[in-house]
């Protein structure tokens, strides 16, 4: 049997082999440690929106797709400057108001605090500012929020969440404005900005199935003959109808508002509505201002003021001359 002798290889081949082994080791190490060093904490939300609408979160009707699962309407606010200069960093402040005393139904049926999340659709060319461009004062307002692009290569559509609502009723987005002198595809002018913000869990999964953060209705008319509690904490409500018994499965979380022996109609609520959250949408505008126009406006206004001053001085001179002639 011939034994492998590494030294028998030519020096050039040995160097190439060593380099390939080192590259392979480095690649494997990077793959194994990337999740530890840089965990993708934001993948939990908005996973559903990205899966159901992978290209854009805004439908042709103008509605943000989050509204398909978060059925309740709640307010959402955004504050941005009316106009910004090229290559400048500004704040886009998103406000998601709700009652801090509210408790939502969690997946296991227990109660807990509300989470918040938002999707911000900026104009083309606008994006989250890199860390070295964010002022120190603005850094303090961010609070360690992780900003994620909705789609790879689409930096102007940004998503955050889920975040604890009691800490992030206001979310500050550090936005970097584009520079038309560096990007010929960007032009000065007015642009639309779209915001979608939610608080709490959704009522419908993308598959169409209702979550336990929902009110459940009777699928048939009849009389409730039996109510049984399940091991998971929910209920099985048996409705005796003309076609036979029908069992309604209700997960843990919603509270029953019916009782055995009660006659019900189709579509009648069997539970209360536990949802305390909701989704809000807000549209606004931002102007990418041309610095040259601002300078021109300043010069124009300065010229007008100078003319007015000269006219006042000239008027005083005329009045002085007229007064002197009258005295003469």
Curated annotation (Swiss-Prot):
Membrane topology: Single-pass membrane protein
Binding-site positions, heme: 45, 66, 69-70
Transcription regulation keyword on record: no
Pfam family, one: Apocytochr_F_N
GO biological process, one term: photosynthesis
Keywords carried by this UniProt record: Electron transport, Heme, Iron, Membrane, Metal-binding, Photosynthesis, Signal, Thylakoid, Transmembrane, Transmembrane helix, Transport
GO cellular component, one term: plasma membrane-derived thylakoid membrane
Cofactor: heme
GO molecular function: electron transfer activity; heme binding; iron ion binding
TM regions (residue ranges): 294-314
Keyword Protein biosynthesis attributed: no
Superkingdom field: Bacteria
Leader sequence segment: 1-44
Protein localization: Cellular thylakoid membrane
Record InterPro entries: Cyt-f_TM (IPR024058), Cyt_f (IPR002325), Cyt_f_lg_dom (IPR024094), Cyt_f_lg_dom_sf (IPR036826), Rudment_hybrid_motif (IPR011054)
Cofactor binding, per record: Binds 1 heme group covalently.
Coarse class of the protein's main subcellular location: membrane
Family named by the database record: Belongs to the cytochrome f family.
Oligomer and partners: The 4 large subunits of the cytochrome b6-f complex are cytochrome b6, subunit IV (17 kDa polypeptide, PetD), cytochrome f and the Rieske protein, while the 4 small subunits are PetG, PetL, PetM and PetN. The complex functions as a dimer.
Function: Component of the cytochrome b6-f complex, which mediates electron transfer between photosystem II (PSII) and photosystem I (PSI), cyclic electron flow around PSI, and state transitions.
Name under which the protein is recorded: Cytochrome f
Species annotation: Microcystis aeruginosa (strain NIES-843 / IAM M-2473)
Gene that produces this protein: petA
């Amino acid at each position: 049997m011939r034994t492998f002798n590494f030294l028998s290889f030519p020096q050039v081949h040995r160097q190439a082999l060593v380099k390939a082994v080192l590259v392979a080791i480095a690649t494997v190490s990077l793959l194994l440690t990337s999740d530890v060093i840089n965990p993708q904490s934001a993948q939990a939300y908005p996973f559903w929106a990205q899966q159901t609408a992978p290209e854009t979160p805004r439908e042709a009707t103008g509605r943000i797709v989050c509204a398909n699962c978060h059925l309740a309407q709640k307010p959402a606010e955004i504050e941005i400057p009316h106009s910004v200069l090229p290559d400048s960093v500004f704040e886009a402040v998103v406000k998601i108001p709700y009652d801090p005393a509210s408790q939502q139904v969690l997946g296991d049926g227990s109660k807990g605090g509300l989470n918040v999340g938002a999707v911000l659709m900026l104009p083309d060319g606008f994006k989250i500012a890199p860390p070295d461009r964010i002022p120190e004062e603005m850094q303090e307002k961010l609070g360690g929020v992780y900003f994620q692009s909705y789609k790879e290569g689409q930096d102007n559509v940004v998503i955050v969440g889920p975040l604890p609502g009691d800490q992030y009723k206001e979310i500050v987005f550090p936005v970097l404005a584009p520079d038309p002198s560096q990007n010929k595809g960007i032009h000065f002018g007015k642009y639309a900005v779209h915001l979608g913000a939610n608080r709490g869990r959704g009522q419908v999964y993308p598959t169409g199935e209702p979550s336990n953060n929902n009110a459940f209705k009777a699928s048939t008319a009849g009389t409730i003959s039996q109510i049984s509690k399940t091991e998971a904490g929910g209920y099985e409500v048996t409705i005796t109808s003309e076609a036979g018994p029908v069992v309604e499965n209700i997960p843990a979380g919603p509270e029953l508002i019916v009782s055995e022996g009660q006659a019900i109609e189709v579509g009648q609520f069997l539970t209360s509505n536990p949802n305390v959250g909701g989704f809000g949408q807000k549209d606004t505008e931002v102007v990418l201002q041309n610095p040259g126009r601002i300078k021109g406006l300043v010069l124009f206004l300065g010229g007008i003021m100078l003319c007015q001053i000269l006219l006042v001085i000239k008027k005083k001179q005329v009045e002085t001359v007229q007064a002197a002639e009258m005295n003469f």
